[in-house]
A protein has these predicted regions:
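Active-site nucleophile and cofactor-binding loops and adjacent substrate-binding regions
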Residues: 35-37, 79-80, 99-106, 125-128, ...
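Short, acidic Gly/Pro/Ser/Thr-rich loop/turn segments
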Residues: 17, 69-71, 142-146, 201, ...
Length: 322
């Protein structure tokens, strides 16, 4: 296989799909196109639309990441009725090599190669170590996390479905919110609060408790909270951010990411420069006897919208080099 192969990259989120080409391990940014998932019934149609705009897809490999679980080369999107298989991806791309990974795995494969300008520091660290374990946490259409291990010339990024673990409960208010979510969905998962629609749920819950169950879209809640024009939006953001910090702290104690914690996803990026004001760092470090340990973990927001595509390119390049 030539060292500078041409590859097809696909990043399928809960709302949009991005398609691009890579030369070797490098993303060709001019090749990136975005498609709305609701306008297509499957990836094959997306790739046909891409080829119609960019010309025939002629590649030696393809790597697709999805917002959903992947097992034995088969993946189903959590918030979209699409199922993908590596043999089908190879067929659609007309490529001899195809890989299907989780979207957080894609972020993890690319995180070590991001330039400093792609990162916004949220929480400083006194004990960060280059090359150590990293943790990537996504808040967007859904929630998930992935731990990143650098093992010499190999990078291991195990998949997880962290967003479907139970919501943490610390206070009576947390318990009431948990029951509110449970009454709607039957199971109070982290993703039911830590996501765009989750923020809407927190706002709705506050209104329900106040006898005024008005609902707003997440973007409007964030706008009102960050401009200080709505007391309820501010309170919703404080609750959301506190739970976000708590969950990130829990994951950090489980994985000990001395190489840093990296926040990704549309909601995380939109809130990145406001997290400090809503108490994220305090919630992250609120771990009782282990509060001091938390100062070892730096936290950055990844502000590169194409980080997952870059990770796909890196992952596929390693696969094709073996």
């Amino acid at each position: 296989m030539p060292s500078l192969h041409r590859a097809l990259l696909v990043d399928i989120g809960g709302t949009n799909t991005r398609v691009a080409i890579a030369q070797g391990a490098e993303l060709v940014t001019s090749s990136i196109l975005r498609f709305r998932n609701t306008e297509f019934s499957g990836l094959d149609q997306v790739l046909a639309a891409y080829a119609a705009k960019q010309g025939p897809i002629e590649v030696q490999g393809a790597c697709v990441d999805i917002a959903g679980p992947v097992h034995n080369g088969v993946g189903t999107l959590t918030n979209l009725d699409w199922t993908l298989e590596e043999p089908l991806i190879a067929k659609w791309a007309n490529a001899p090599v195809a890989a299907l990974i989780n979207d957080l795995q894609a972020q993890g494969h690319g995180v070590a190669d991001l330039p400093p300008q792609a990162l916004h520091r949220v929480v400083d660290s006194s004990g960060a170590r280059a090359g150590s374990t990293r943790l990537v946490v996504n808040v967007g259409t859904g929630f998930n996390a992935a731990v990143v291990f650098d093992l010499g010339d190999h990078r291991l990024v195990p998949a997880s479905e962290s967003g479907h673990a139970n919501l943490p409960i610390r206070t009576e208010a947390d318990l009431r919110l948990c029951r509110f979510v449970e009454n709607i969905h039957g199971f109070p998962a982290i993703e039911d609060v830590l996501s765009g629609r989750g923020l809407e749920r927190v706002y709705h819950w506050l209104g329900t408790e106040a006898g005024d169950p008005v609902q707003l879209p997440a973007a409007e809640i964030m706008a009102q909270a960050t401009t200080g024009t709505s007391a309820r939006a501010i309170e919703a953001m404080r609750i959301f951010t506190r739970i976000f910090g708590t969950v990130c702290g829990n994951l950090s104690l489980i994985h000990l990411p001395f190489g840093g914690v990296y926040l990704v996803g549309g909601v995380a990026c939109a809130l990145g420069r406001h997290l400090h004001g809503f108490g994220f760092a305090e919630a992250f470090r609120d771990k009782g006897r282990f509060a001091g340990m938390m100062s070892n973990f730096a936290i950055d927001v990844i502000e590169d919208d194409y980080a997952a595509l870059r990770g796909n390119a890196r992952h596929l390049a390693r696969l094709m080099a073996t």
